[in-house]
Design a protein with these regions (language model features):
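Flexible "cap/lid" loop of the alpha/beta hydrolase fold
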Residues: 109-110, 114-144, 186-190
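Short beta-strand/loop motif that positions the catalytic acidic residue
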Residues: 202, 208-210
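Conserved alpha/beta-hydrolase
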Residues: 40-62
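Conserved acidic catalytic loop of the alpha/beta-hydrolase fold
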Residues: 72-88
Length: 263
């Protein structure tokens, strides 16, 4: 197994009976959680971890990034859970949400799961087709980002994909290091439908969250994910795909924190 970067923020005050493990989405790494979410949940008493999947952030495997599969990322999550060795709530964003779903469906264990702007259980084929109609230029630019990294596209592309117009232009430069190239293979993996793996485990507590202005997923797709898990989705208005770094990130974090209190 490759060596994986894990960022950990220790709890402040009395610690909680379970910890949190955050899994990033495509084109990103663990550092995206450390802007707001890791320190915030640490103040609430949670040990908060974030892992960079292989080829991302400071994890090993960057040279082989184009060939990493969804199965590789699921194996990374399983290895991280085993390494941490503590009761965990898994919180996955976008591709990370799909990694969490596949991990649980293939025998992985967790206290609960939160899916944020997650790839639906049935894959990304319909959202990809929708993006081709809504914003074909963005799809082309994301292809360049996937292959060559942020240096080949301007920061405005990352903003269109991940952030709302409410993020000041002066803030964009500090977010640019949070993004990187992505595996072409895993994007193909997420387009496919596996009827034997998509059905979720109904006994696991799951919270499903989405954003009204998501460039990748329309609210109906987030709601379909929630129905698959026998729950309802919360869609945050005036919010883009990068929910953890949006101006109203605290609304998302507080919604998760309130739900964690019910476990």
């Amino acid at each position: 197994m490759p060596r994986l970067e894990i960022i950990t923020r220790a709890p402040q005050g009395q610690s909680r009976p379970f910890s949190l493990l955050f899994v990033h989405g495509s084109f990103s790494h663990a550092g995206i959680w450390d802007v707001n979410f890791l320190p915030y949940f640490a103040t609430l008493g949670y040990t908060a971890h974030a892992v960079s999947l292989r080829g991302h952030g400071q994890s090993e495997g960057r040279s082989l990034l184009p060939w990493h599969s969804l199965g590789d990322y699921v194996a990374d999550l399983a290895d991280t859970v085993d390494q941490l060795g503590q009761p965990l709530v898994l919180i996955g964003h976008s591709m990370g949400g799909m990694v969490v779903q596949r991990y649980l469906r293939t025998g992985g264990t967790a206290r609960a799961a939160v899916l944020m702007a997650s790839v639906p259980p049935y894959g990304m084929w319909d959202s990809t087709v929708g993006m081709l109609f809504r914003d074909p230029l963005l799809v082309h630019q994301l292809g360049l980002l996937m292959t060559f990294g942020p240096g080949i596209v301007n920061i405005a592309t990352i903003r269109r994909a991940m952030l709302s117009d409410r993020v000041p232009a002066s803030e964009l430069a500090r977010y640019e290091p949070l993004f990187q190239s992505e595996s072409q293979r895993v994007v193909i993996d997420m387009l496919t439908f596996d009827p034997f793996l998509w059905r979720p485990e109904p006994s696991l507590p799951v919270r499903v969250l989405g954003a009204s202005d998501d460039a990748f997923l329309i609210p109906a797709q987030i709601e379909a994910t929630a129905r698959a898990f026998g729950t309802t989705a919360t869609i945050f208005p005036d919010m883009a795909h990068g929910m953890m770094i949006e101006p109203d990130w605290r609304l998302v974090a507080d919604t998760i924190a309130d739900w964690l209190e019910t476990l």
